[in-house]
């Protein structure tokens, strides 16, 4: 009985560890890919904003636009990583 219990626990743990490493790998891969995409978008946006007059840039800075862009980019990356991990595990269909 103890041997059977040890086999069942060993199988469950090995399956869990394998799935955990798989999900972490998919999450990291997705995060790295999307980070490059969002950084590329923000790098394209930056030259467009630097061509604006200084008083408009000051108003945008006071309004918190640079921080808002950073927050939105981070939220997109976080949500995409979570969704890809869930889809790979099978939680999302």
UniProtKB/Swiss-Prot annotation:
Bilayer-crossing regions? 25-45, 56-76
Q: Which UniProt keywords apply?
A: Host membrane, Membrane, Transmembrane, Transmembrane helix, Viral penetration into host cytoplasm, Viral penetration into host cytoplasm via pilus retraction, Virion, Virus entry into host cell
The record ties this protein, via Pfam families, to:
DUF2523 (PF10734)
Topology with respect to the bilayer: Multi-pass membrane protein
Question: Which cellular components does GO assign to this protein?
Answer: host cell membrane; membrane; virion component
Q: Name one GO biological process term.
A: symbiont entry into host cell
InterPro entries with a match to the protein in the record: DUF2523 (IPR019670)
Q: Where in the cell is it found?
A: Virion; Host membrane
What is its quaternary makeup?
Interacts with G3P; this interaction is required for proper integration of G3P and G6P into the virion.
The job of this chain, per UniProt, is described as:
Plays essential roles both in the entry of the viral genome into the bacterial host and in budding process. The formation of the G3P-G6P complex termed adsorption complex is essential for correct termination of filamentous phage assembly.
Family per similarity comment = Belongs to the inovirus G6P protein family.
Q: State the name under which the record lists this protein.
A: Head virion protein G6P
This protein's species is Pseudomonas phage Pf3 (Bacteriophage Pf3)
The protein's gene is named VI
């Amino acid at each position: 009985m103890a041997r059977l219990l040890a086999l069942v626990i060993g199988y469950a743990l090995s399956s869990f560890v394998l799935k955990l490493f798989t999900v972490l790998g998919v999450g990291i891969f997705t995060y790295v890919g999307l980070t490059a995409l969002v950084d590329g978008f923000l790098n394209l946006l930056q030259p467009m904003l630097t061509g604006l007059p200084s008083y408009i840039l000051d108003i945008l800075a006071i309004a918190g636009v640079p921080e808002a862009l950073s927050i939105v980019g981070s939220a997109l990356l976080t949500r995409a990583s979570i969704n890809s991990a869930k889809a790979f595990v099978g939680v999302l269909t």
